[in-house]
């Protein structure tokens, strides 16, 4: 079981193509947690490459924040690909997107997303979201270690 200790930062992989949203998310986590590191990639293909590069060391991120509408490999396709990789099936994925479309929500959960959140409208709401993610996914939830 994965536990977070003060000496080991929590690593979040953020898949986000909008630089403004990426900055807001990273800044929000910086404000709420000293021990959370956000690494940003701008599309689904880059996310798969990042995860593939980390396969040899087994140093996968602790959490993946995923915008659905990213270029090259759509977020839903990325979710499906994660389930095809045995080492990645336990990686917690939170979809963080502007879409409130019922089919996007249903398809995300069908493809094993752990949560579906709609992006906030302002900085303070991003900070509240980061605090909630940190408190639940980083500090409270008991998660399996990567295979």
Q: Can you say where each PLM-predicted feature lies in the sequence?
A:
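Non-catalytic signal-transmission and effector/linker regions of two-component phosphorelay proteins
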Residues: 1-13, 17-34, 124-147
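Conserved active-site segment of CheY-like receiver
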Residues: 17, 96-100, 120
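Acidic, metal-coordinating helix/loop segments flanking the phosphotransfer/catalytic sites
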Residues: 40-63
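His-Asp phosphorelay/catalytic-motif detector in bacterial-type signaling
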Residues: 59-62, 87-92
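Active-site residues of response regulator receiver
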Residues: 66-68, 97
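The feature encodes the CheY-like receiver
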Residues: 71, 101
């Amino acid at each position: 079981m994965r536990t977070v200790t003060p000496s080991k930062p929590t690593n979040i992989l953020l898949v986000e193509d909008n630089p403004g949203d990426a900055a807001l998310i990273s800044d929000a986590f910086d404000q709420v947690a000293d021990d959370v590191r956000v690494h940003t990639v701008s599309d689904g293909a880059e996310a798969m490459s990042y995860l593939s590069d980390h396969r040899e060391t087994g140093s996968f991120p602790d959490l993946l924040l995923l915008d659905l509408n990213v270029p090259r490999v759509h977020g839903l396709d990325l979710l499906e690909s994660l389930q095809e990789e045995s080492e990645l099936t336990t990686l917690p994925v939170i979809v963080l997107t502007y879409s409130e479309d019922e089919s996007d929500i249903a398809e995300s959960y069908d493809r094993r997303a752990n949560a579906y959140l709609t992006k906030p409208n302002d900085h303070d709401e991003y900070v509240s979201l980061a605090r909630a993610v940190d408190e639940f996914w980083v500090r409270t939830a008991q998660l399996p270690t990567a295979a």
